Amino acid sequence: MGKKRINEVSTTEGAPAEKKKKVEKWLNTSSEDGEGTKKKKRPWRNKVRKLAAKKAAAERRVENSEESTILEPVATAEEATKKKKKRGPKKKKYKPEAAEVEKKNEEGDTVKENPIAEAKKRLDAGRFRMLNEKLYTCTGSEAFDFFKEDRTAFDLYHRGFADQVKKWPNHPLREIIRWLQAKPDKQAVFDLGCGEAKIAEAVGEKHTIRSFDLVAVNDRVESCDMSKLPAEDGSADVVIFCLSLMGTNLYDFIKEARRVLRTGGVLKIGEVTSRFVSIKQFCEAINKMGFETTNRRQLTDYFMMFDFRKIDKVEQKRPYGLKLKPCLYKKR
């Protein structure tokens, strides 16, 4: 009956406005009666059902657990050992002391190293860089006082320096030793900043060698500040600075070297090439302090060697140009 009436209404095109209003009113009333309408959702019912389901599931779990504790038989000793066998042996815990790292030495052979020892090496290398920076950025007297209080720091520095030297393709010290070996006459040689006194070890029988450094690492070394040498005026034929012009008071070192040298004596300097701001200005500055340049040459791409002869005339005590950049190692 409802469909018939809808069809009749749809065919009445062009009907007057009053008739249309009646039709719309009838359609609204029919929709209210329930034809073609959806039921309203009741979300609170679903919530209640979910809570009830959860509660029931929890109760079932409690019941099941109680039953299992009552009915489960106790395992015998034999069954327990069988279970252990099935599990297999326990994995050994990782012990860093026992672990070893394979590395290649200088000969190319694989060498096993303990990671703890490796970590200690890295710490020592870091402290060496710190000490190295300190030596290049303080005066000689400050460095002397520092190492006097902490002898272990000096030992650590020299170990680190020895490790660095192993990586160098050449060392100016070898050139100086060859030069001294070629000297026919016996010379009084002062090795300033000597380290382990390698010059005294190599040519000590041929020449009279006095080795000076901030700390005496062996019997051949005299401990002192290089700007205050325990020696008389004009007592040396040769004064050597091999990679040892490290303090900020370079003028004091050169002045002291001139004091202990006899007139005509040789001041020999071996230094890293990259430290020089200007090689020409460096030589001119030393010449003004009472020397003349007799030899200047580059040993390799890394090192320079200078020979100066002491003369009587001193033009300036603190000339311009006597400057060296600090030789700092890159941080890793």
Curated annotation (Swiss-Prot):
Amino acids binding S-adenosyl-L-methionine: H158, G193, D213, D225, M226, C242
InterPro entries linked to this entry: RRP8 (IPR007823), RRP8_N (IPR042036), SAM-dependent_MTases_sf (IPR029063)
Region annotation Disordered: where it falls in the sequence: 1-109
Feature: compositional bias, Basic residues: 38-53, 82-94
Residues annotated as signal peptide: none
The protein's enzyme class: transferase
Subcellular location: Nucleus, Nucleolus
Record GO cellular component, one term: chromatin silencing complex
GO molecular function, one term: methylated histone binding
Biological process according to GO: cellular response to glucose starvation; methylation; rDNA heterochromatin formation; regulation of transcription by glucose; rRNA processing
Keyword terms of this UniProt record: Chromatin regulator, Methyltransferase, Nucleus, Repressor, rRNA processing, S-adenosyl-L-methionine, Transcription, Transcription regulation, Transferase
EC number(s) reported in the record: 2.1.1.-
Compositionally biased residues, Basic and acidic residues: 95-109
Domain of life: Eukaryota
Function of the protein: Probable methyltransferase required to silence rDNA.
Family as reported in the entry's similarity comment: Belongs to the methyltransferase superfamily. RRP8 family.
Full protein name: Ribosomal RNA-processing protein 8
Provenance organism: Caenorhabditis briggsae
